[in-house]
């Protein structure tokens, strides 16, 4: 039956290829060679499969499958299955587990806390070694040093720099003062005597007023 089915399949395939390759150049000749190769391959496969089936030996049932020691009876298996659920202990409820955890945690909570190490510095008098007494300064000495530094910084802050006291242009103010002072000093050292009837007025009073006004204007600028 298998050979007949294979022959029918080859014939159907050959007819289909001949119909589709009739319009091709050299199609029939090519199809004949392909058909011959297909027939030979199919015949070889059928022959080899039949030969293998004929020479295949029949293996007897293995002794391992028939050994009763390896395959215990079904009743023993059922007994083991029934006994196994009883051997397994049921899990404890959640309430009992929480109580056990609380009992285990309470001793840890009741333990006394460890003694804290004091971080207070010891004074120089508490040190046992006399050579180390000078290395640790006392608190009073530090306070005195801080107070001395604070008092020295306050006057420095109160004192204004020379640039601020003289104005925005200190050099210009100095130059103007020198020029006006030189102009005022050019006059006679001793003023001429004035008659007693006239009121004695200083000759440099207007120049001094002008100098003061200019200096104030420059300093304000």
UniProtKB/Swiss-Prot annotation:
Record bears the keyword Acetylation: yes
GO terms under biological process: cell motility; neuron differentiation; positive regulation of transcription by RNA polymerase II; response to fibroblast growth factor
Keywords tagged on the record: Acetylation, Cytoplasm, Nucleus
Pfam families: IER (PF05760)
Modified residues (N-acetylmethionine): 1
Entry's localization field: Cytoplasm; Nucleus
Region (Disordered) location: 105-155
Similarity remark: Belongs to the IER family.
Identification of the protein by name: Immediate early response gene 2 protein
The organism of origin for this protein: Mus musculus (Mouse)
């Amino acid at each position: 039956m298998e050979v007949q089915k294979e022959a029918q399949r080859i014939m159907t395939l050959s007819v289909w290829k001949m119909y589709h390759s009739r319009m091709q150049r050299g199609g029939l000749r090519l199809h004949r060679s392909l058909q011959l190769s297909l027939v030979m391959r199919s015949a070889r496969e059928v022959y080899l499969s039949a030969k293998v089936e004929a020479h295949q030996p029949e293996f007897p049932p293995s002794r391992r499958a028939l050994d009763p020691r390896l395959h215990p009876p079904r009743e023993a298996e059922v007994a083991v299955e029934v006994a196994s659920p009883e051997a397994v202990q049921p899990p404890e409820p959640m309430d009992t587990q929480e109580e056990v955890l609380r009992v285990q945690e309470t001793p840890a909570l009741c333990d006394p806390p460890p003694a804290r190490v004091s971080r207070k510095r010891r004074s120089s008098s508490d040190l046992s070694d006399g050579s180390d007494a000078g290395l640790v300064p006392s608190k009073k000495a530090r306070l005195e040093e801080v107070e001395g530094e604070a008092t020295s910084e306050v006057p420095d802050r109160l004192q204004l720099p020379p640039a601020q006291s003289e104005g925005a242009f200190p050099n210009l103010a100095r130059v103007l003062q020198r020029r006006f002072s030189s102009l005022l000093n050019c006059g006679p050292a001793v003023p001429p005597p004035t008659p007693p009837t006239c009121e004695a007025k200083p000759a440099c009073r207007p120049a001094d007023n002008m100098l003061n006004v200019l200096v104030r204007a420059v300093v304000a600028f």
